[in-house]
């Protein structure tokens, strides 16, 4: 049996990208939620190369009197999950909570995650109730969740919700992983001994627009498929075997029909032959594209470039800046 250690300090990690409108409310509500815990806490806000005034606002928040905010400024935009990993490398708490900056996941849910983690869970996930997103976002999310569940075998209901709590040893384990394509919720579940999900509220986005465009969602799907499992390669081999057997069977059938009905019948089956040919060609291109994705990610990992570069870390005035 593993001993259950109570949470002593909470670190809240929030990636920020062009969120100047929501930042004041985000900081106020998150601070209030953390103060209600009656524990030590820190709020780490990571500016992911914002082009608006977000970085300046984060610096001011860290330098305010009695601030608990640590601002981490990246030199450019690296993506949500890389920004969160940058925050993980600077946390000091024994429970780390991730939260989006758009306030669709209410910071007021933080005490519930802490209470559940105190029961001994390594990872506390969340499932959004009554999602206030567009039909396209909800449909894409359902497809991605099903894809993840089938390829990884991890039965979690809502991988897209970033409001989650991780014990410190889970975060330390993730920091030892050096692959460039990272999806934090799944990576955490690989190391978790005990994980659970709880329902949380989901609000409409009050400020700005979602930073996930259609193409970024497509890239995310490829990241999920190629960086976490080799199942698609095995499925590709199975599909190739089925197509090969099907093609051989059709060839035998065509020979039998030609011998039975004569060469005149074969001329009338030209379009069928073209259809079969195009099917094979399409399957080959799909396979080549998938293999290319894997090879591209291998190439990226072999280069071993850092997944992010921290330009500056601003801690509260009582602590030294880095």
Curated annotation (Swiss-Prot):
Pfam families: Glycos_transf_2. It is found in: Cell inner membrane. Its main location: membrane. The chain crosses the membrane at residues 236-256, 270-290. CDD domains: DPM1_like_bac (cd04187). It is an enzyme of class 2 (transferase). The keyword Cell inner membrane applies. GO terms for cellular component: plasma membrane. Its EC number is 2.4.2.53. InterPro entries: ArnC_tfrase (IPR022857), Glyco_trans_2-like (IPR001173), Glycosyltransferase_2 (IPR050256), Nucleotide-diphossugar_trans (IPR029044). Keywords: Antibiotic resistance, Cell inner membrane, Cell membrane, Glycosyltransferase, Lipid A biosynthesis, Lipid biosynthesis, Lipid metabolism, Lipopolysaccharide biosynthesis, Membrane, Transferase, Transmembrane, Transmembrane helix. It catalyses: UDP-4-deoxy-4-formamido-beta-L-arabinose + di-trans,octa-cis-undecaprenyl phosphate = 4-deoxy-4-formamido-alpha-L-arabinopyranosyl di-trans,octa-cis-undecaprenyl phosphate + UDP. Pathway: Glycolipid biosynthesis; 4-amino-4-deoxy-alpha-L-arabinose undecaprenyl phosphate biosynthesis; 4-amino-4-deoxy-alpha-L-arabinose undecaprenyl phosphate from UDP-4-deoxy-4-formamido-beta-L-arabinose and undecaprenyl phosphate: step 1/2; Bacterial outer membrane biogenesis; lipopolysaccharide biosynthesis. Belongs to the glycosyltransferase 2 family. This is Undecaprenyl-phosphate 4-deoxy-4-formamido-L-arabinose transferase.
